[in-house]
Amino acid sequence: MAAGSTGERPFFEIITSIRYWVIHFVTLPSIFLAGFLFVSTGLAYDAFGTPRPDAYFQASESKAPVVSQRYEGKSELDVRLK
């Protein structure tokens, strides 16, 4: 081992190894697919508590509500949603 070496394999050697690609050939698409399903099924909205795209506005509204009082904004929106 050379002086100053940490004993780790060089990055180029890792990404050119067959073992790296055998492992990542399965894991990388799996992570992408899991993320796609997490978002497309709506589970992401439930997990993070964000409103779904169709819940931002009520059917009778055509634009975003305007909050007039800075510190009472939440109560204004709560009244609007009732």
From Swiss-Prot:
Database matches in Gene3D superfamilies: Photosystem II cytochrome b559, alpha subunit (1.20.5.860)
Membrane topology category: Single-pass membrane protein
Note on how the cofactor is bound: With its partner (PsbF) binds heme. PSII binds additional chlorophylls, carotenoids and specific lipids.
GO CC terms, sorted: photosystem II; plasma membrane-derived thylakoid membrane
GO biological process, alphabetically ordered: photosynthetic electron transport chain
Binding site for heme: H24
Top-level taxon in the UniProt lineage: Bacteria
Location within or outside the cell: Cellular thylakoid membrane
Cofactor: heme b
Transmembrane region(s): 22-36
N-terminal signal peptide: none
GO molecular function terms noted in the UniProt entry: electron transfer activity; heme binding; iron ion binding
Coiled coil: none
Keywords on record: Electron transport, Heme, Iron, Membrane, Metal-binding, Photosynthesis, Photosystem II, Thylakoid, Transmembrane, Transmembrane helix, Transport
Subunit structure, interactors included: Heterodimer of an alpha subunit and a beta subunit. PSII is composed of 1 copy each of membrane proteins PsbA, PsbB, PsbC, PsbD, PsbE, PsbF, PsbH, PsbI, PsbJ, PsbK, PsbL, PsbM, PsbT, PsbX, PsbY, PsbZ, Psb30/Ycf12, peripheral proteins PsbO, CyanoQ (PsbQ), PsbU, PsbV and a large number of cofactors. It forms dimeric complexes.
Role: This b-type cytochrome is tightly associated with the reaction center of photosystem II (PSII). PSII is a light-driven water:plastoquinone oxidoreductase that uses light energy to abstract electrons from H(2)O, generating O(2) and a proton gradient subsequently used for ATP formation. It consists of a core antenna complex that captures photons, and an electron transfer chain that converts photonic excitation into a charge separation.
Alphabetized PANTHER family for the sequence: CYTOCHROME B559 SUBUNIT BETA-RELATED
Name the record gives this protein: Cytochrome b559 subunit alpha
Organism of this sequence: Parasynechococcus marenigrum (strain WH8102)
